[in-house]
């Protein structure tokens, strides 16, 4: 669609995509992917006077990060975060649990517990060391599994990415679009 409008674009696969069997994606961080995107900008600047970054979800977050560093002339963020990674995960859990009809009290208790647990993961604590005693019994098994999956370099870094802290540093034009019915990247 961009090419039909006379807009040049550079697309690339995620780091390690061509050799996915030997690459452990959980060891990469949002910062690593941001560096990958930043590496393309000097190449584009050789041919174009204005260079922007368009990204969806994590890519929208990366666009915000690059803009905050002054590396883009404009950005388009399609469902990128404008809050922290931790807040995003808690909000996604809240929306998913509410959508299946769980009582508000259960949702609130779970989200408060998972928020504290994610703080501990973000600070480097292992999933097996996190106390979830305040969690509703019915939700403990899925919580343990979720925390084990979150116990990775990628998630530890993601939890600490806080786009709200970057917004005041962005000086270029921004088009930020979010769908009202998209609960995954709200």
Short names for language-model regions:
Residues 2-19:
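Conserved alpha/beta-hydrolase
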Residues 42-97:
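Primarily recognizes the serine-hydrolase "nucleophile elbow" in alpha/beta-hydrolase
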Residues 184-186:
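Conserved alpha/beta-hydrolase "acid-adjacent" motif
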Residues 16-28:
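Glycine-rich "HGGG/HGxG" loop immediately N-terminal to the catalytic nucleophile
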Residues 170, 176-178:
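Short beta-strand/loop motif that positions the catalytic acidic residue
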Residues 180-182:
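Acidic beta-to-alpha connecting loop that harbors the catalytic carboxylate
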Residues 27-45:
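Alpha/beta-hydrolase active-site loop
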Residues 78-168:
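Accessory cap/linker subdomain of secreted extracellular hydrolases
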């Amino acid at each position: 669609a961009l090419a039909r409008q006379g807009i040049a674009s550079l697309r690339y696969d995620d780091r390690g995509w061509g050799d996915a069997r030997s690459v452990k994606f959980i060891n990469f961080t949002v910062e690593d992917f941001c560096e990958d995107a930043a590496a393309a900008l000097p190449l584009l600047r050789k041919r174009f006077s204005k260079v922007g970054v368009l990204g969806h979800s994590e890519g929208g977050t990366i666009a915000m990060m690059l803009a905050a560093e002054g590396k883009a002339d404009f950005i388009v963020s399609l469902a990128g975060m404008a809050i922290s990674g931790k807040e995003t995960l808690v909000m996604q859990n809240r929306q998913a649990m509410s959508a299946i009809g769980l009582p508000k009290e259960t949702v609130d208790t779970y989200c408060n517990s998972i928020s504290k647990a994610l703080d501990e993961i973000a600070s480097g604590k292992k999933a097996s060391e996190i106390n979830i005693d305040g969690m509703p019994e019915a939700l403990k098994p899925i919580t343990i599994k979720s925390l084990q999956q979150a116990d990775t370099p990628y998630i530890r870094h993601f939890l600490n990415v806080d786009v709200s802290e970057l917004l005041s540093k962005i000086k270029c034009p921004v088009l930020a679009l979010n769908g009202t019915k998209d609960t995954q990247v709200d």
